[in-house]
Amino acid sequence: MNLSEAKELNGSLQESAISDGGQLKRSLKLRHVVFIGLAYMSPLAVFDTFGIISDITGGHVPAAYLLIIVAIFFTAYSYGRMVKKYPSAGSVYTYTRKTMNAHLGFLVGWSAMLDYLFLPMINALLASIYMSSAFPGVPSWIWIFLTIVITTALNLFGVKLAVIFNYLLVILQVLVTVIFVILTIRMIMYGDTGNTFSLNPFYTEQLSFPAVFAGASILALSFLGFDAVTTLAEETIEPKKNIPRAIFIIALSAGAFFVTVTYFMQSLFPDVSVFGDIEGASPEIARYIGGALFHSIFISGYVVAVLACGITQQMSASRLLYGMGRDGVLPKKFFGYVHPRTGLPVFNILLVGALALTAMFLDLTEAASLINFGAFVAFTFVNLSVIVYFFRREKNRSVKSIITSIIIPGAGLAFNIYLWFSLEKSAMILGVVWAAIGFVYILYLTKFFKVSPPELSNNDQ
């Protein structure tokens, strides 16, 4: 995709974002949708958790990625099935509401909202980890604060540039990663490390499956966004064909990319305990394989990517809150407010920025687990939606139908539930508390289930 195409696509997305009614223009082709999904995920996400996952799994990060890829593929299949059944702009909130129950759909959407609200927090935390690697004398909270101030300010004053250049940043991130892999391979082959290429990153006699499952439950963070393209169904040409294809292409491309990169990293460093800061293992590896120059390039590229990703995620979260406020799901006076001059939901942008400040009090494992609670709620219920749809709506009871509507989504359901319960205990507690708040709130909204909850408009899901 060239810059002119990015500008053209930016125009259509901006037009869609401010449209309150009517049909959204179908202007997105398959390649556009794939690029949007990859931009949302951020290819450099592969470096985010390498250190902590290697520590948890005992040096089997690629094995943990293979496990989460299986769960993601089953879930991608279920998303594809539901897009074909409900081709309007949708999400797991829509699918649960349509196939099961409006109240349950609200609670699922409420739990999944954790992803949107706290992804900017993860970005700020990652920025502080990488900047602290370059400037160890500066307290990490300063980098967190500066990152949030910058992303919030750009959301308030300069978001259009971020939309255009996100596409260029995807290419930049891939180039930085390719250089990283080449330098890693060179170090394994010609460096005096004593390490070789083997299957040890995937399997050794010391491999612990519970530990690999625990690692995989955190690695779901790397895939957040692969399903976000389902919300573009109304803007995509031939959505029943192109959205399912895009979901699989995004999941397959990202999965192969993550496994390849972490295989070479793990081959070079089977034991990350040699690093003083396990969370910051990736920038230290960059310094080791490429010296101070590549370390600076790596840090610079990563921080720019984090800022761009943070801008997009803060924009998405504030827009979601605005949609819920406008439709009466949340208090309209605050969440439905739009600044009369800028046309932006400024209160929501500031609120998401304030929530991101909680990064000062969490480590990367806790923060990733908290966000993944919402992700596994979404992944679990999209698989369950396919099964429920089969029993309630599907008349075909052939062997093929049973395989595609029960066995495949059932496998995805089982994988995701197991991964869900492999999360950190603190994340499970916070997730359950968040869900309980949502339950109390829906009791208030529906007058103890006497009325249906407000429905979120399609173009904001």
Residue ranges, per PLM feature:
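Membrane-interface "cap" regions at the ends of multi-pass membrane proteins
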Residues: M1-G51, D55-H60, I72-Y77, A89, ...
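Helix-loop-helix connectors at the membrane interface of multi-pass transporters/channels
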Residues: L3-A6, E15, T94-R97, A124-I144, ...
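Helix-loop-helix junctions that connect adjacent transmembrane segments
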Residues: S19, L24, G58-P62, L66, ...
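Extracellular loop-to-transmembrane helix junctions
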Residues: V46-W143, T147, I250-T260, G431-V440
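Membrane-helix boundary/coupling elements in multi-pass transport proteins
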Residues: S88, S111-L125, F223, A228-T236, ...
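TM-loop-TM module centered on a large, flexible mid-protein loop between adjacent transmembrane helices
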Residues: T94-Y95, N101, S133, A246-I311, ...
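Membrane-interface loop-to-helix entry segments
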Residues: S140-T196, I247-L252, I371-V382, T404, ...
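A generic transmembrane alpha-helix motif of multi-pass inner-membrane proteins
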Residues: A375, I403-Q461
